[in-house]
UniProtKB/Swiss-Prot annotation:
Binds to the 23S rRNA. Residues 1-38 are annotated as: Disordered. The keyword Acyltransferase does not apply. This is Large ribosomal subunit protein uL15. One of its GO terms (cellular component) is cytosolic large ribosomal subunit. PANTHER family: 60S RIBOSOMAL PROTEIN L27A (PTHR11721), LARGE RIBOSOMAL SUBUNIT PROTEIN UL15 (PTHR11721:SF3). Belongs to the universal ribosomal protein uL15 family. It comes from Methanothermobacter thermautotrophicus (strain ATCC 29096 / DSM 1053 / JCM 10044 / NBRC 100330 / Delta H).
């Protein structure tokens, strides 16, 4: 149980209640403005010492239009979905190999996470190196479409 008397009660009758000179409590004048005010003027030495990179531009930002954002899919997901895709008619089976165009599923690039358990002939705009290796290991084919 807390038995400490509140500071405001203890300071009754003291006029400034622990705030020093009464002018110090008025507005933000005593501290030279609020926050970062005066960074170019009277707080310049503070800026130089504690936040030297506050003004100006630093670093490099890649132009957003040069960044390629592709819809990707992993081999594990495709391997899991093959029976359903065959059933729906999105994929077909030719020469004991499942033929699938991943663009029909809304994907543009095939990534190599997971493993593929059957030979597949996949068509996409791009394949990662590991995806190509795994597809060919399983006896399949990775066809890049321009």
């Amino acid at each position: 149980m807390i038995r400490k008397r509140r500071k405001i009660t203890r300071m009754r009758g003291s006029r400034t209640v622990g705030g020093g000179c009464s002018k110090k409590r008025r507005g933000a004048g005593h501290r030279g403005g609020r926050g970062q005010a005066g960074g170019h003027k009277h707080h310049w030495t503070w800026i130089v010492k504690y936040d030297p990179k506050h003004f100006g531009k630093y670093g490099f930002k890649r132009p957003q239009k040069l960044i390629k954002r592709l819809e990707t899919v992993n081999l594990a997901y495709l391997d899991e979905m093959i029976p359903e895709l065959l059933e729906r008619g999105v994929a077909s089976e030719e020469d004991g190999m499942v033929v699938l165009d991943v663009r029909d599923l809304g994907f543009e690039k095939v990534l190599g996470s997971g493993r593929i358990t059957r030979p597949v002939h996949l068509k996409a705009y791009e394949f990662s190196r590991s995806a190509t290796e795994k597809i060919e290991e399983a006896g399949g084919k990775a066809e890049v479409i321009e």
